[in-house]
Swiss-Prot record:
Gene Ontology terms: cellular component: cytosol
NCBIfam families linked: rrf2_super
Protein name as it appears in the record: Putative HTH-type transcriptional regulator YffB
Annotated Pfam families: Rrf2
Length: 156
């Protein structure tokens, strides 16, 4: 499995916006410049985060984006759903019957499908158990975020 680059970009967008003073917003251009990523791709990502209710969009000359939820209420899985979409990670094509050449057998489900369903369930649980607040706290503990905060202040 591979997460798109949009997932990681989304996490950092959310972490940056969480550091904004209350009632402040930031433009997608400023975020793209800070992360050194494609502005057009980041706009699509941000739209997905807004559509999923993780970000709030404020229109107007001084508009931009801000968090719509607290970091402790946003999990890695919430970001995953916003960026990668809803639905199954693995969808069986039903190839077992073609493989064995008949529809008869002892098992009701394909062993491959069963294993991948269990893997998906574990992944969903794991992603759901990691909040962005945990990530923010760990990042704050391990790194000096002074340069980031100075940059945010300069955006005023």
């Amino acid at each position: 499995m591979k997460l798109s680059s949009g997932w990681e970009q989304s996490v950092y967008v959310l972490l940056i916006l969480a550091r904004l003073p209350e009632n402040r917003t930031m433009s997608s251009i400023a975020l793209a410049n800070r992360l050194k990523v494609s502005p057009s791709y980041l706009k699509k990502i941000i739209k997905s985060l807004v559509d999923e209710g993780l970000l709030r969009s404020t229109p107007g000359k001084n508009g931009g984006f801000s968090l719509n939820k607290e970091l402790h209420d946003i999990s890695f899985y919430d970001v995953f759903l916003a960026i990668e979409g809803r639905g199954r990670i693995f969808q069986s094509q039903g190839l077992l019957q073609n493989f064995i050449g008949s529809e008869s057998g002892k098992a009701k489900r394909c062993a491959i499908t069963s294993a991948l369903d269990e893997i998906e369930n574990t992944l969903v649980r794991t992603l759901s158990n990691v909040s962005l607040a945990q990530v923010a706290d760990e990042t704050q503990y391990n790194y000096n975020l002074g340069y980031l905060d100075e940059w945010i202040d300069e955006m005023d």
